[in-house]
């Protein structure tokens, strides 16, 4: 009997690279979507840090009045921001090679587009990487589905809203006070507080926080003790164990008696599906609301909707909100030639019954 030994052909460099990229044994899973995610997020992060520290002022309104947003130009952590691209650029794609010089690119807010575009590509790559990793481990894809909610929200404020408004200068500035400024201006121009999709988003975020706190406290309070009184309860568990960690029957009974019977779940799958579904759907609706308001399908307007028998207006909270919106709009549009149309086109509202006497 003759035995023949053959040398095994070594895998090519490409095959070894593919095996390494898709290996679930790596300390951090990379995956093919990670090949897209890693360079784009690194680019966005690097440019953001540099721009936040040292970017020169940007002509955001396209009227030769640059606005400084970086730390080296007098801002602090709270007031600093990466200023959106100039209104003179509109929604045109504005990479570095489209500008006549680097100074012109910086003056027109080119870093904002570079950061936003790479960031959105990166977070989409993160979604794909979550799905890919789950697939290779034999898990179901709901982790990546849940992450579509924040990605939809980011896409709404950084991409869809500027496109709908006709300029990337209307996008959300990349900073703390810039975010609040964006929120105030958005309310002034679109009355988002009166939009049902935003209200669903508020219910999703605050409701999700409440349900998460309730669930965590109930689980922690109903752990099954596997140790003695002299040992920490944490020593009685190991990651991936088959046995239940907590007593869902006890938690269900406690909560059912605290409120009422049908307010609690006695099925762990249904409970956790609900905990994941509630905030995700709420944020989906908020993102959808931003996208509809991007094209000026705004919140409800109930201004001057209540009148008495003589036809005189009885002011409601909607009218107070409208007055606040007009005030925020005036503060936002600080140039006379940009005077808000909703103020310029309507009848003048008296703010004083008599003119003040001026002594001088």
Swiss-Prot record:
PANTHER family: PHOTOSYSTEM II D2 PROTEIN, PHOTOSYSTEM II PROTEIN D1
Subcellular locations according to the entry: Plastid, Chloroplast thylakoid membrane
Protein source organism: Rhodomonas salina
Residues holding chlorophyll a ChlzD1: 118
Job description of the protein: Photosystem II (PSII) is a light-driven water:plastoquinone oxidoreductase that uses light energy to abstract electrons from H(2)O, generating O(2) and a proton gradient subsequently used for ATP formation. It consists of a core antenna complex that captures photons, and an electron transfer chain that converts photonic excitation into a charge separation. The D1/D2 (PsbA/PsbD) reaction center heterodimer binds P680, the primary electron donor of PSII as well as several subsequent electron acceptors.
Any GO BP: photosynthetic electron transport in photosystem II
Protein name according to UniProt: Photosystem II protein D1
Keywords assigned: Calcium, Chlorophyll, Chloroplast, Chromophore, Electron transport, Herbicide resistance, Iron, Magnesium, Manganese, Membrane, Metal-binding, Oxidoreductase, Photosynthesis, Photosystem II, Plastid, Thylakoid, Transmembrane, Transmembrane helix, Transport
Site, as annotated: Cleavage: 344-345
Keyword Transmembrane recorded: yes
Residues at which a quinone binds: 215, 264-265
Gene behind this protein: psbA
Family: Belongs to the reaction center PufL/M/PsbA/D family.
Membrane-crossing residue ranges in chain numbering: 29-46, 118-133, 142-156, 197-218, 274-288
